[in-house]
């Protein structure tokens, strides 16, 4: 999507609506379809990209890419480090942040069967029952396990290399307290969570979570 800098008239309209920015030059907007009158009491910091027809109110937004038709209403602390997909809805949230270098739960080892940790399984968002069974009950297949673990670690590294977290297209996040280092899939609904940290919520349009 092509972006452009704000015009002075748009900046004046935003300021009149109670919006502010550390540096307006770091706020980019969709070349077509951006309407400053749809933003109220929003504070921007860092690098910001805003799509067309966004509806933003009562929020502090830092280093985010906000897609077309996104609605954000009521972020009490901060929304930081996310790419927010087209048509997503984020309302009544305490804080929602994503730090560069996190793996969103991918590669984290958890004890399975043996709680002393002798059969730790690395989690990742493509984990199947068959792969988990292999890692827990076939420890003698050392070369197969090594290759499996290496693939999972390599995948986790690709997640860590991403500059931002992700909220999927058409996702809804509402009434949540604190969300930290969590990736959220397309069409997912997250409602009333007190704390979510270091994880991935898998979802897709044909099978929403």
Predicted regions and their residues:
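Terminal amphipathic alpha-helical/low-complexity segments used for targeting or macromolecular assembly
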Residues: 1-165, 169-170, 176, 187
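Core mixed alpha/beta domains of very large multi-subunit molecular machines
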Residues: 165-209
